């Protein structure tokens, strides 16, 4: 026969068991939350928004890279500087364009309890499940373009492409008598970048003397991929006047044209990203005429600062634009200085606002409002 004390112990044990079951069920339900899936327009970021609880995770900022192209390395430089300034441990992984490897690397970061993760996805769809788990764990997840993310970085993609396309169209009219064979090196594996190439086609559409002789995505979006694709294109179209795309593939295409002995000073090679090698080519005054800057170390530094703020329980932007600007010989010196000193840019509101625009607010307590749709500031 049970004593009163034993019955009380049993009741307490039962209550505790029920609580644990409820708590486990509640936690599981939380993991099933899907974030913001319906596209919306975020208001301007409020830097004075209330703080919330900080996550109880390691003060580590990790960067999961798709590859080691210059644009990605620039992001890493900015992140490393921010981590140093905010006393965070900085760690990186490189997937070498292998989607399965990236999933394993991100899962390793998640299971080790890193407090902040920035990711440049290889395959956004396959990576999404582990990113959602990472977000729900309480980790800051900053994504370069595709969702899901605590805070998503994008560029106004149509405007970025139009800035390059309009510059090419102007050059064709003024320097090539309105006639040109054009190559567009696209990025079909990342649908979120497609507005760039829509804009380039729109810019060239009204020029009757323009023939787009190739509109194709290289097998790999890097210098080697651009080189290989351009070699193939030159077999069918040995005379090319204009090449447009991301800097890394356009640089590869330029190398292929040089290798074939088909380079001319009046050609127009133009890219996007403001990569170091592209800037060096522009300085030479040769066929590489322009690069549309997406200052990677500047926004990398900003993402690192947001990661540190998140870990302190502060409210950070849900989304951020990196604004495009056309690099010319006249403004390259200032641009290079900004890339080398992104912390100075970030601390100067006037300079920062020429590169970045921030939207929405989110913190650890409101992480159920993570971005799970392809956000763009150009959405109407």
Which residues does each PLM region occupy?
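Flexible loop/hinge segments that line or gate small-molecule binding clefts
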Residues: 124-159, 181, 275-284, 288
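Hydrophobic alpha-helical segments within soluble ligand-binding/sensing domains
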Residues: 46-48, 102, 153-179, 194-195, ...
């Amino acid at each position: 026969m049970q004593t009163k004390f034993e019955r009380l112990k049993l009741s307490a044990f039962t209550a505790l068991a029920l609580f644990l079951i409820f708590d486990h069920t509640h936690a599981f339900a939380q993991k099933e939350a899907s974030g913001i899936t319906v596209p919306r327009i975020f208001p301007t970021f409020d830097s004075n928004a209330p703080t919330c609880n900080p996550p109880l995770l390691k003060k580590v900022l990790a960067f999961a890279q798709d590859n080691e192209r210059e644009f990605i390395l620039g992001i890493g430089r900015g992140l490393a500087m921010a981590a140093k300034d905010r006393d965070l441990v900085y760690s990186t992984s490189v997937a070498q364009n292998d989607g399965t490897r990236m999933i394993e690397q991100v899962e390793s970061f998640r299971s080790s309890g890193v407090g902040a993760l920035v990711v440049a996805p290889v395959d956004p769809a396959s990576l999404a499940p582990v990113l959602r788990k990472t977000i729900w764990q309480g980790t800051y997840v900053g994504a370069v373009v595709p969702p899901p993310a605590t805070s998503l970085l994008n560029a106004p993609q149509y405007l970025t492409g139009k800035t390059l396309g309009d510059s090419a169209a102007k050059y064709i009219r003024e320097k090539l008598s309105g006639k040109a064979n054009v190559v567009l090196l696209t990025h079909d594996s990342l649908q979120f970048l497609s507005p760039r190439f829509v804009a380039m086609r729109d810019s060239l559409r009204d020029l009757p003397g323009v023939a787009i002789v190739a509109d194709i995505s290289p097998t790999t979006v890097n210098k080697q991929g651009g080189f290989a694709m351009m070699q193939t294109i030159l077999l069918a179209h040995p005379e090319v006047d204009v090449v447009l795309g991301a800097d890394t593939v356009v640089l590869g295409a330029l190398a292929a044209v040089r290798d074939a002995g088909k380079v001319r000073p009046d050609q127009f090679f133009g890219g996007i990203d403001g990569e170091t090698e592209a800037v060096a080519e522009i300085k030479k005054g040769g066929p590489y005429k322009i690069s549309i800057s997406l200052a990677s170390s500047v926004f990398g530094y900003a993402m690192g600062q947001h990661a540190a703020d998140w870990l302190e329980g502060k409210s950070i932007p849900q989304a951020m634009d990196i604004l495009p600007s056309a690099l010319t010989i006249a403004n390259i010196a200032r641009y290079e200085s900004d890339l080398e000193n992104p912390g100075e840019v970030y601390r100067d509101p006037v300079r920062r606002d020429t590169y970045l625009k921030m939207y929405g607010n989110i913190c650890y307590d409101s992480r159920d409002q993570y971005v799970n749709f392809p956000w763009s500031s150009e959405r109407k």
